[in-house]
């Protein structure tokens, strides 16, 4: 049995008011790697099939497909062989169910975790500090809606995997799905596109702060923890669990809903950025508190309505929704208000999808400057925005603007991904090609 030997420079400790946490035993500078953790289990998003290797998450052309289901793609025979213990859970089922094979990403990940747990004889390299079974589940905090969703996931697991997997009892499944809900990571690329879902037990020990001193990024199927501030010996390390663009009330609501806790970091107690994030238009008539409150309610409803509409509305209808809400919000909010920025960012995404590059640039240019003010210094949200803009400028033959945007993205990426990361070397190559 592999013992919990620890990670050099990192200590687990009882963090006051937060339960378990991690702190450093030596100093770390900005951009320095604190530690990395291989995924315990992971699954590639269906939308990325054919573009990324199912085993190592390398993006490349000319991947070889599985001869049986023709739906899984690999770098080579070696990757395919390594992935078989997991792919065999799905290969025959995909052939049998055909178009009706539709388990959620969460269900697919849990199936793989169950298979891994069954085959596992000793502590894995993903569990140097924390065993998978020791992760928080928060079963007692689940409301009826979450419980129903979990029951639906369990039904999906039985429907799609019962032929190839022996399941633990119902209570154990409830716990496992809850653990994945609270501790699962969305693996993202340099443009923050969703590549898949994974579980990293050791990374789950990181507590949250809205003013984080580390960031979690990905190198293939490994998660890496890098410093985004200078960290002194004895300091706790914090990452952010959520998008930090929004004002304090919104962040706290999201943390309570998703992770069952409230944050008391400096940013949440001082609310120092809220005035800037909620900037109001300068008008000849005074804008009253009620008008602002009503518009905040409208903005939050618009965001939720848009999120739901993405499932079934056409790009044209979605863009119209964005434009209508931006116009209405603009009567009260300034263009740098986070609710307007949110809808502009969505509008940019639709323009990219429909290949309206001029439209995408128009929205992107409105968003990028406020982003650099409202997000922390080394933010993937800012880097990915500069990257997208850079690629749009190049496509529109605006090379100087493209190189400038790439350079700004690179400054952030070298810190959050590391100077030797493929994303960084590929971007440098892209810049040299011009």
Swiss-Prot record:
What is the protein name for this chain? Answer: N-lysine methyltransferase SMYD2-B
Under Pfam families, the record lists: SET (PF00856), zf-MYND (PF01753)
Any one Gene Ontology biological process term? peptidyl-lysine dimethylation
Q: Does the keyword Transcription apply?
A: yes
Compartment list: Cytoplasm, Cytosol; Nucleus
Instruction: Extract the SUPFAM superfamilies matched here.
Output: SET domain
Checking InterPro entries in the record gives: H3K4_H4K5_MeTrfase (IPR050869), SET_dom (IPR001214), SET_dom_sf (IPR046341), TPR-like_helical_dom_sf (IPR011990), Znf_MYND (IPR002893)
Which spans of this chain does the record mark as coiled coil?
none
Residues given in the record as Zn(2+) 1 binding sites: 53, 56, 75, 79
**Per its record, what are the GO molecular function terms?**
histone H3K36 methyltransferase activity; histone H3K4 trimethyltransferase activity; protein-lysine N-methyltransferase activity; RNA polymerase II complex binding; zinc ion binding
What are the alphabetically sorted keywords of the record?
A: Chromatin regulator, Cytoplasm, Metal-binding, Methyltransferase, Nucleus, S-adenosyl-L-methionine, Transcription, Transcription regulation, Transferase, Zinc, Zinc-finger
- Enumerate the SMART domains for this protein: SET
Q: Which residues belong to any copy of the SET domain?
A: 8-242
């Amino acid at each position: 049995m592999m013992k919990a030997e620890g990670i050099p420079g990192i200590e687990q400790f009882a963090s006051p008011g937060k339960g378990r946490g991690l702190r450093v035993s030596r100093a770390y500078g900005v951009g320095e790697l604190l530690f990395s953790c291989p995924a315990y289990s992971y699954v590639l998003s269906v939308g990325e099939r054919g573009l990324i290797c199912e085993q190592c998450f390398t993006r490349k052309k000319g991947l070889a497909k599985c001869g049986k289901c023709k739906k899984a793609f690999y770098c080579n025979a070696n990757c395919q062989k390594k992935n078989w213990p997991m792919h065999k859970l799905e290969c025959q089922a995909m052939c049998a169910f055909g178009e009706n094979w539709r388990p959620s990403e969460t269900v697919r990940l849990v199936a793989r975790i169950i298979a891994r747990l069954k085959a596992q004889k000793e502590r894995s390299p993903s569990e140097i500090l924390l065993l998978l079974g020791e992760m928080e589940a928060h079963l007692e905090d689940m409301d009826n809606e979450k419980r129903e969703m979990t029951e639906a996931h369990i039904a999906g697991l039985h429907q799609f995997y019962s032929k190839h997997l022996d399941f633990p009892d119902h209570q154990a499944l409830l716990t496992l799905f809850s653990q994945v809900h609270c501790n699962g990571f969305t693996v993202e690329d340099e443009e923050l596109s969703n590549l898949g879902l994974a579980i990293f037990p050791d990374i789950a020990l990181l507590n949250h702060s809205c003013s984080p001193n580390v960031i979690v990024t990905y190198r293939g199927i490994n998660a890496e923890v890098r410093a985004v501030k200078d960290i002194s010996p004895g300091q706790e390390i914090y990452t952010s669990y959520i998008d930090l663009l929004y004002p304090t009330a919104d962040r706290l609501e999201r943390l309570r809903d998703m992770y069952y806790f409230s944050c008391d970091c400096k940013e949440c107690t001082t609310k120092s950025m809220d005035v800037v994030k909620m900037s109001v238009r300068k008008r000849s008539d005074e804008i009253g508190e009620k008008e602002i409150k009503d518009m905040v309610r409208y903005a939050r409803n618009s965001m939720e309505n848009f999120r739901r509409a993405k499932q079934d509305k056409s790009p044209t209808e979605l863009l119209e929704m964005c434009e209508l809400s931006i116009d209405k919000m603009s009567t009260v909010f300034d263009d740098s208000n986070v609710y307007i920025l949110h809808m502009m960012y969505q509008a940019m995404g639709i323009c990219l999808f429909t290949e309206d590059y001029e439209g995408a640039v128009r929205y992107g240019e409105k968003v990028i400057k406020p982003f650099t003010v409202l997000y922390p210094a080394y933010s993937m949200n800012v880097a990915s925005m500069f990257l997208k803009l850079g690629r749009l400028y190049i496509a529109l033959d605006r090379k100087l603007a493209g190189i400038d945007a790439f350079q700004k993205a690179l400054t952030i990426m070298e810190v959050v991904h590391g100077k030797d990361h493929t994303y960084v070397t590929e971007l440098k190559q892209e810049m040299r090609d011009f």
